[in-house]
């Protein structure tokens, strides 16, 4: 249901994301049926966010200047009631990243927080191994998602071998996906943009259902791509993944 709605709405998804993943993110959104815009100019965003459906803030290539950009962009999005997705990339890897992430969460209206276990654990004060965007293995993603949902009072998606979605104290665990996905730079960052497109094209009446479908669509596309690229390597997997996103239909995830 939500996937078909996304394709019909063609949500304008503003992505202020990191320099490593911009091309992949834009192509992934286009494949799925969304309309990406990668603007980083406040004067431009003043107009774009009047008609946008969602805003992604991904702090991957963080600078002091980009911190100010995030703040101003979120202010404009909040003023125009545009949902904001925050991906606090490598939040546990440095004090500066943690400071920026907490500032955005505590001082602005965020609609969705998404990250891996190490990133979200750092935000709630739990020590976990972190090595940048890849993070470390975290034992209890469910409890981390629930606690972050309670602490920040926003829906939370925590990714890992099992993905956890927490909304208003309710949690859902998902186990789809491919082990090849973490081997392609940008799959986690593209996910944040995909989640933004899904919630931006929904009526927000049931975020848990919407996010569950978004995660399942994304992860099943990874499973399909793995089969197509079997024996070929991660380069072929990346292409197959974009192909799979472009061909996804709701009936393909009915039994997942």
From Swiss-Prot:
InterPro entries: Hyethyz_kinase, Ribokinase-like. Its EC number is 2.7.1.50. Disulfide bonds: none annotated. Keywords: ATP-binding, Kinase, Magnesium, Metal-binding, Nucleotide-binding, Thiamine biosynthesis, Transferase. ATP binds at residues 114, 159. Pfam families: HK. One of its GO terms (molecular function) is magnesium ion binding. The keyword Repressor does not apply. Pathway: Cofactor biosynthesis; thiamine diphosphate biosynthesis; 4-methyl-5-(2-phosphoethyl)-thiazole from 5-(2-hydroxyethyl)-4-methylthiazole: step 1/1. One of its GO terms (biological process) is thiamine biosynthetic process. Transmembrane segments: none annotated. Its cofactor is Mg(2+). It catalyses: 5-(2-hydroxyethyl)-4-methylthiazole + ATP = 4-methyl-5-(2-phosphooxyethyl)-thiazole + ADP + H(+). Substrate binds at residues 38, 186. Gene3D superfamilies: 3.40.1190.20. Catalyzes the phosphorylation of the hydroxyl group of 4-methyl-5-beta-hydroxyethylthiazole (THZ). Belongs to the Thz kinase family. This is Hydroxyethylthiazole kinase. It comes from Streptococcus agalactiae serotype V (strain ATCC BAA-611 / 2603 V/R). The gene is thiM.
């Amino acid at each position: 249901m939500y996937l078909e709605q996304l394709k019909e709405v063609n949500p304008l998804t503003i992505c202020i994301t990191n320099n490593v993943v911009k091309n992949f993110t834009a192509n992934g959104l286009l494949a799925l049926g969304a309309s990406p815009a990668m603007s980083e100019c406040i004067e431009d965003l003043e107009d774009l966010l009047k008609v946008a459906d969602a805003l992604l803030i991904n702090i991957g290539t963080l600078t002091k200047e980009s911190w100010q950009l995030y703040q101003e962009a979120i202010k404009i999005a909040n003023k125009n009631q545009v949902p904001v997705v925050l991906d606090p990339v490598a939040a546990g890897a440095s004090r500066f990243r943690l400071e920026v992430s907490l500032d955005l969460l505590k001082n602005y209206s965020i609609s969705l927080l998404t990250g891996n276990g190490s990133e979200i654990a750092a935000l709630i004060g739990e020590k976990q191994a972190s090595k940048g965007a890849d993070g470390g293995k975290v034992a209890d993603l469910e409890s981390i998602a629930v606690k972050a949902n309670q602490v920040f009072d926003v829906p939370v998606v925590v990714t890992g071998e099992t993905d956890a979605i927490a909304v208003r104290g309710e949690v859902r665990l998902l186990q789809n996906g491919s082990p090849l996905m973490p081997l392609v730079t940008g799959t986690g960052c593209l996910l944040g943009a995909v989640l933004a497109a899904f919630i931006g094209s929904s009526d927000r009446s049931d975020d848990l259902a919407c996010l569950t479908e978004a995660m399942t669509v994304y992860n099943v596309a990874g499973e399909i791509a793995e089969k197509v690229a079997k024996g070929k390597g991660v380069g072929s997997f990346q292409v197959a993944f974009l192909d799979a996103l472009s061909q996804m239909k709701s009936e393909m995830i009915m039994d997942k």
